[in-house]
Amino acid sequence: MAKAGEKSVGGGKRGLKRKAAAEEPQEAAAASDGTAESGVQPAKAAAFPPGFSISEIKNKQRRHLMFTRWKQQQRKEKLAAKKKLKKEREALGDKAPPKPVPKTIDNQRVYDETTVDPNDEEVAYDEATDEFASYFNRQTSPKILITTSDRPHGRTVRLCEQLSTVIPDSHVYYRRGLALKKIIPQCIARDFTDLIVINEDRKTPNGLILSHLPNGPTAHFKMSSVRLRKEIKRRGKDPTEHVPEIILNNFTTRLGHSIGRMFASLFPHNPQFIGRQVATFHNQRDYIFFRFHRYIFKSEKKVGIQELGPRFTLKLRSLQKGTFDSKYGEYEWVHKPREMDTSRRKFHL
């Protein structure tokens, strides 16, 4: 009898729930009719309450749907805020406040104590006494030897040949198993001022060694994103023999200043502007982008550029005093990722 009584009580509860559920739509309809008659619109319920978390939804399809709606709602709110701000600026006219500068990794860069001041006497003294002083004093003219690692493949060979058309008075030499320590004395004896070695891995150029002769320094770079002339879309005709102009961007620290002077010493002093050719080394976030362009003058006020190629990206790995010596060489700077790459806003060049 007790069990039967419990069942009847449970059945009564279920009946009350069904009755309440049936009455709720009727009450909502009556409330809507009342607001329509009075002319007052009901307040919209918040689509996403403050304590709501989409990640708590267990159903994957429902969770994806709610996330899409949330993104759409955010996009609408952002667009409405932009329109409102635009109207306010138009209403203020000239009195409108200046637009805020967007935050980027570059303009939020951590200040480096070694940033070079061009007017500093110490910097001027270092420039007058360093290994590149003879070049900048016009006592020597650059003469470059370009070589590769042992048994180079076609892509690396073509890159060397194209580099020799970019850098004036440069000569390509294939090593044939000769060690770098034996090549350097021969280069010095033949009055070469710089040695460029392009390394490869799996038939792809992946490294560049630049050694200034006869007393160094020697820089080792990682090379990536190599594009030869045939791989560049809408490229111009092959470069002429005119001496190109050189542009160095964003080499601001003492280390970057040294690297910039190394690149500058590869090209002669007096560019032939009639050739309209320019070689650019652009440093951005410690990546050095190399591009070779030709100016296209459309009118007296308009000018365009046409890429000639090749193009590649360099990342400095080490800077060594003196010429190349992998065993006993003294390093001025070595890139140590675990110790140096602690912040995305800290750069070394």
From Swiss-Prot:
Molecular functions (GO terms): RNA binding; rRNA primary transcript binding
Region (Disordered): 1-58, 71-105
Entry function: May be required for ribosome biogenesis.
InterPro entries: Brix, IMP4/RPF1
Annotated protein name in UniProt: Ribosome production factor 1
Region (RNA-binding): 303-320
GO biological process terms, semicolon-separated: rRNA processing
Location in or out of the cell: Nucleus, Nucleolus
Domain Brix: 142-325
Pfam hit, one: Brix
PANTHER family associated with the record: RIBOSOME PRODUCTION FACTOR 1, U3 SMALL NUCLEOLAR RIBONUCLEOPROTEIN PROTEIN IMP4
GO cellular component: nucleolus
Keywords per UniProt: Nucleus, Ribosome biogenesis, RNA-binding, rRNA processing, rRNA-binding
Listed Basic and acidic residues bias regions: 87-97
